[in-house]
Amino acid sequence: RCGATTAVICPGSRSTPLAIALANHAHIIAIPILDERSASFFALGRAKKTGLPTVLVCTSGTAGANFYPAVIEAQQSGVPLIILTADRPAELRNCHAGQTIDQVKLYGNFPHWQCELALPEASLAMLSYLRQTIVHAWQQSLSPTPGVVHLNLPFREPLAPIKQPLSEIETQFPADFFETIISHLPAKNFISLPWNNWRGKSGIIIAGLAQPQDPEAYCRAIAFLSQQLSFPVLAEALSPLRNYGQLNPYLISTYDSILRQPAAQKLIPEVVIQVGELPTSKQLRNWLKDIDVPRWVIDARVDNFDPLHGKTIHFHASITQALDHTKAENNPQSPYCQQWCKLEAITRVNIDHTLTSLEQMYEGKAAWLISQNLPSGTPIFLANSMSV
């Protein structure tokens, strides 16, 4: 689904699940090569020719070490390779179980990205994790420049396939489980945001911790996006958006409280646009995980900003770059956005009333009192946890 067409497989016992899955895939050419060094350079040549990552598979132990020269060559010459090394589970490591070495970060600093996957588990949550990790690995092998990605995959026995009716497997997946997987990356010099996927829908913009070089330009860009789509903006306390709140009438700061209310059931969006990191609010994160709607992540960095492993699509550009050449349109406030803004106003009044009537001092009230009484524009430094 990402776009892989070729897998080079070095046969071995521990990599049996990978070999069979790739060999049985109708759209992947699986090529078996016994010698690992030869296989790795063949995969390198194939990737050079196609411009797409070639998947290279081997079993546990020293097999993966034979890929090392090709890994260095691929990284130095900018060739996309995705290496899958099978491994024994944790309980069979460091105990002379045989055909076992430390395969974590086997190739040092040469890969663009590397990680060890969790043990396979037939649950929707873990399959979502696997889906998003594979999508991220594919993107890392191609962007910002082509190179090597190494995934270490532990497997427990039994390694051979277990017969299971296809219908049982298919019922585990929601109809849109694979919908957000795209087989290409946006062009490096121009990011085309999917306005047609967003306009006319109920949606939110969420913005986490950010330290942009030009905070006002960053806030103006998000305010522009918000008002063009009539999407409310749920802004992290440590985001500069709250310092420039006058730029955007759709700014929501009390979302953590709003999402604890019964009214949150009526606020489920069709689209979520995430700018940078997720806000730290556990309430927001749990809500996003429960609703699991398509999420579009906009950030210039190539990191994976999806700890929820949801249906995400990444745009590797800053929010200001992403909105270059976008023409403004006059759009009225949508009923969905009005709901959020109304709840924001009500919740703010309730919070102020509660803190005003509260006689006992605590961290939350101290921060609120300071913000109410200091002159506008006065810098305030708040420590961790409750006060923030």
Describe each region flagged by the PLM:
Residues R1-A4, R46-G51, Q140-T145, I191-I204, ...:
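Glycine-rich phosphate/diphosphate-binding loops that line cofactor/substrate pockets in enzymes
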Residues Q99-G147, A322-L323, A328, S334:
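Conserved thiamine diphosphate
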Residues W287-V388:
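Phosphate/pyrophosphate-binding active-site segments
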Residues T16-E91, T280, V388:
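Thiamine diphosphate
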Residues A207-W296, N304:
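Glycine-rich, anion-gripping cofactor-binding loops and their flanking helix/strand elements
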